[in-house]
Amino acid sequence: MNRVNPKALLISLAVMLALDTLGGMILTIFFASQSVRENTTPEQTRAAVEALNQSSGFLLSALAYGTFTTILGGYLAARLAKRLPYFNAGALGLAGVAIGIFLSGSSPLWFDIVGFFVTLPAALYGGHLSKRDVPPNA
């Protein structure tokens, strides 16, 4: 018996990654706009964006937003699966950690560690929230 609903996992993972990408772009534009001006060279722009990866404000904002999208992804995985909400939300969290390990790179170590330790609990919390929204006789 398969406990993880693959369709629910893939859809919720795609939504979570799309929201993460969009949010990352918005955060980058917001934070970079403070240091990049109209007549900035491409090298200066690249340096400003690389400096963002070391900026505490940017990184904390990215962690908060990523945690929100992970909660949303866990909620969505659990709702779409229609059964075993914690198991399906947890599978999403583990997939998120695996992707995070694969994509980690230029950010500080503390950022990666906090992100990895927050991902699974955030996804499980999303699964918990989905349980609250389902009537007991469903």
Give residue ranges: language-model regions:
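Juxtamembrane/disordered regions of integral membrane proteins
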Residues: 1-138
